[in-house]
Amino acid sequence: MKTLTVHTPSHSYPIFIGNGLLPQAGSLLKPHLGKRAAIITNETVAPLYLGTLQTALDAAGVSHFSIILPDGEAHKNWQTLNLIFDGLMQNRAERKTTLIALGGGVIGDMTGFAAATYQRGAPFVQIPTTLLSQVDSSVGGKTAINHPLGKNMIGAFYQPQAVLADLDTLHTLPARELSAGMAEVIKYGTLGDISFFEWLEQHMPELMALERAPLIQAVYRCCQMKADIVAQDETEQGIRAWLNLGHTFGHAIETEMGYGTWLHGEAVAAGCVLAARLSEQLGKISAADTARLAALLEAAGLPSAPPVFAFEKWLEHMSHDKKVSGGIMRFIGLNRLGEANITEITDTDILRRTLQPYL
């Protein structure tokens, strides 16, 4: 097991990364739990891992109840959030009841937002069961639900008490979901660590085969990078925006196609290539750099091109992006592979040129 600590102005918390951790969840997490816990999970994860977690909590003397939600990005909304609140109130959850998110990014985001708002703030912990959530969404305190006009538009910054990432849960992950998570792994190398990017180029087959040693190394490096960035910029006033590489274009894809049609990681993959193409247009990187990024994404089973839709739709969706400031769109671009930047775009013609092959 590897452990690292996330330090933020609000508080610090541990991330536990390894294999076979879920049966130890009671003992590992007990210092970070109240006397009672609410497990929030979904219909897919519950049959696989809920029983193991319940047994672990019983052994640690933590009482608990469970709330099982429908699965999928299409359910990341007010209606499903209210199911969490209904379950908490029906079970007389108190402010010190710890919410436990057992699932992927959707469960983690919604559980965190429920925790941030239930009785004005209850503690929560993350037990991410997908690669995407283990390397990205479970760490850093971003919580949200979607709105029909934009992804993650309603939410809060609210840090968990702990994160427990059991890599064994990835063995039940569908291949498409594994690839989607790998998009976020590749994103980290692309935005801030060229040596990690090169390591991914060398080890992608082993990672996709879930070989234990390279997998734990990759997950640890991603969490380490995110922890370092979040420590500097908890509420995304500056450098943390780099973690949104590919997300401005990616969220536009998800919104246009309907939440869940393209998985988040698939949209981010295509979005990263578009961000690279935009950086090409600005003279920052070469076409060869963009091709190299696209090749790595494709090696992970990911799309390197977006779906085709009208330029006006792209602009409409991207105008709702959370990085927009003073009406000016801001994109995360690249100075080079391994180094991101924040780019303000006032001339939409450059966006049209970037997107032209896909209009």
From Swiss-Prot:
<feature type="binding site">
    <location>
        <position position="151"/>
    </location>
    <ligand>
        <name>NAD(+)</name>
    </ligand>
</feature>
<feature type="binding site">
    <location>
        <begin position="169"/>
        <end position="172"/>
    </location>
    <ligand>
        <name>NAD(+)</name>
    </ligand>
</feature>
<keyword id="KW-0170">Cobalt</keyword>
<keyword id="KW-0520">NAD</keyword>
<comment type="function">
    <text>Catalyzes the conversion of 3-deoxy-D-arabino-heptulosonate 7-phosphate (DAHP) to dehydroquinate (DHQ).</text>
</comment>
<protein>
    <recommendedName>
        <fullName>3-dehydroquinate synthase</fullName>
        <ecNumber>4.2.3.4</ecNumber>
    </recommendedName>
</protein>
<dbReference type="GO" id="GO:0009423">
    <property type="term" value="P:chorismate biosynthetic process"/>
</dbReference>
<dbReference type="InterPro" id="IPR016037">
    <property type="entry name" value="DHQ_synth_AroB"/>
</dbReference>
<keyword id="KW-0028">Amino-acid biosynthesis</keyword>
<feature type="binding site">
    <location>
        <begin position="105"/>
        <end position="109"/>
    </location>
    <ligand>
        <name>NAD(+)</name>
    </ligand>
</feature>
<dbReference type="GO" id="GO:0008652">
    <property type="term" value="P:amino acid biosynthetic process"/>
</dbReference>
<comment type="pathway">
    <text>Metabolic intermediate biosynthesis; chorismate biosynthesis; chorismate from D-erythrose 4-phosphate and phosphoenolpyruvate: step 2/7.</text>
</comment>
<dbReference type="GO" id="GO:0005737">
    <property type="term" value="C:cytoplasm"/>
</dbReference>
<dbReference type="GO" id="GO:0000166">
    <property type="term" value="F:nucleotide binding"/>
</dbReference>
<dbReference type="Pfam" id="PF24621">
    <property type="entry name" value="DHQS_C"/>
</dbReference>
<feature type="binding site">
    <location>
        <begin position="71"/>
        <end position="76"/>
    </location>
    <ligand>
        <name>NAD(+)</name>
    </ligand>
</feature>
<dbReference type="Pfam" id="PF01761">
    <property type="entry name" value="DHQ_synthase"/>
</dbReference>
<keyword id="KW-0963">Cytoplasm</keyword>
<keyword id="KW-0862">Zinc</keyword>
<dbReference type="GO" id="GO:0046872">
    <property type="term" value="F:metal ion binding"/>
</dbReference>
<feature type="binding site">
    <location>
        <position position="184"/>
    </location>
    <ligand>
        <name>Zn(2+)</name>
    </ligand>
</feature>
<dbReference type="InterPro" id="IPR050071">
    <property type="entry name" value="Dehydroquinate_synthase"/>
</dbReference>
<feature type="binding site">
    <location>
        <position position="247"/>
    </location>
    <ligand>
        <name>Zn(2+)</name>
    </ligand>
</feature>
<dbReference type="InterPro" id="IPR056179">
    <property type="entry name" value="DHQS_C"/>
</dbReference>
<comment type="similarity">
    <text>Belongs to the sugar phosphate cyclases superfamily. Dehydroquinate synthase family.</text>
</comment>
<dbReference type="GO" id="GO:0009073">
    <property type="term" value="P:aromatic amino acid family biosynthetic process"/>
</dbReference>
<feature type="binding site">
    <location>
        <begin position="129"/>
        <end position="130"/>
    </location>
    <ligand>
        <name>NAD(+)</name>
    </ligand>
</feature>
<dbReference type="GO" id="GO:0003856">
    <property type="term" value="F:3-dehydroquinate synthase activity"/>
</dbReference>
<feature type="binding site">
    <location>
        <position position="264"/>
    </location>
    <ligand>
        <name>Zn(2+)</name>
    </ligand>
</feature>
<dbReference type="InterPro" id="IPR030963">
    <property type="entry name" value="DHQ_synth_fam"/>
</dbReference>
<keyword id="KW-0547">Nucleotide-binding</keyword>
<keyword id="KW-0057">Aromatic amino acid biosynthesis</keyword>
<keyword id="KW-0456">Lyase</keyword>
<dbReference type="InterPro" id="IPR030960">
    <property type="entry name" value="DHQS/DOIS_N"/>
</dbReference>
<feature type="binding site">
    <location>
        <position position="142"/>
    </location>
    <ligand>
        <name>NAD(+)</name>
    </ligand>
</feature>
<keyword id="KW-0479">Metal-binding</keyword>
